[in-house]
Amino acid sequence: VEWTDAERKAIASL
C-alpha cells in the first residue's frame, strides 16, 4: 500500500 503525498510528507518530516 502506498501512502498519499500528504502522509508521505508527514513521515519524511520526522
Swiss-Prot record:
Transmembrane segments: none
Molecular-function GO term, any one: metal ion binding
Keywords carried by this UniProt record: Heme, Iron, Metal-binding, Oxygen transport, Transport
UniProt record similarity statement: Belongs to the globin family.
Function statement: Involved in oxygen transport from gills to the various peripheral tissues.
Protein name in the entry: Hemoglobin subunit beta
